[in-house]
């Protein structure tokens, strides 16, 4: 008498768990909180100094890529005003970024050299990941 009930209960539980797992993997949303630090660095240059600024940033990023805790950097250019340059950086250690990274010789040199091709100090903001959304 209990066999049909147990079989039905097991079937029901497996169906619910399968449905929940499927919904989570196909929702287009991934609760992806982690300890990574996301940094947005906004630079302003002039039209005349644009190529020099991009070249110097390229050289800097080649050195930064060798650092521990580096994940990636994306350089974005404003299509409406190419004198606006944005670095979208990802690091797996906030302490490293705010500490040792800021003291590296290549970054210190860039900060001095940038005075000749960057208009003022950059706007820097720090972010943490909450979710990732992707196409279904």
Region annotations inferred by a language model:
Residues 1-10:
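Bacterial N-terminal signal peptides that target proteins for export
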Residues 6, 22-37, 74-81, 111-136:
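Glycine-rich beta-strand-turn "strand-cap" elements at beta-sheet edges
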Residues 37-44, 72-102, 127:
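Short, well-ordered beta-strand segments in beta-rich or mixed alpha/beta enzyme
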Residues 49-72, 106:
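Short amphipathic alpha-helical segments
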Residues 67-71, 90-125:
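An amphipathic, aromatic/His-enriched active-site/gating alpha helix that lines ligand/cofactor pockets
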